[in-house]
Amino acid sequence: AIGLVGSEMCIRDRLVIGYIDDGGKGMIEASLDSGAFDTFVLSDGMIGQSIVDNIGADLEGSFGSMPGAISKGSAKFGELAAANGMDGSAPYVGESYDAAAIIALAIQAGGSADKQSILNNIAKVSNAPGIVINPGQLSYGLQMLAAGKDIDYQGATDVEFNAFGDAAGAFKELEVSGGEFVTVGAL
């Protein structure tokens, strides 16, 4: 963040756009070693426990954002992922899960794996009205579509498409606190 103090510009935080175990880690270490910065704004590629484990307490108070919803669906997805040995909170994991589920549901709704049929059915299976489908309920959603019912797939990220076919994004703000990333809000 850049701010003005009196009439002088000061830079308090360093924005780090990189990857956890690659160049981004080196930028943080060099900044800490030189004393240039002590708080970091982290891109989604820098969010993960390994960076906190590698840097340690010096990363405390640093923050960033990444895609993700704060909802019952995202909590359920996190539980399902953990039960299957995965980190459901990692960047783009929920979005990838939802994309695959929506494609499967759109194929079922259209009765075809043709790309135009999938495109025509994405919003139909992802928007209200319909029976709400959450993470872990893909089979149920497929059964409801086969029975001719309308569904509203919400998934891990509360998917909703607008009239132009665009999905509204959800983002989480995270901060390093107590040796781990904690979600402090939604953007």
Task: Describe the role of every protein-language-model region.
Residues 1, 7-8, 12-187:
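Extracytosolic ligand-binding ectodomains
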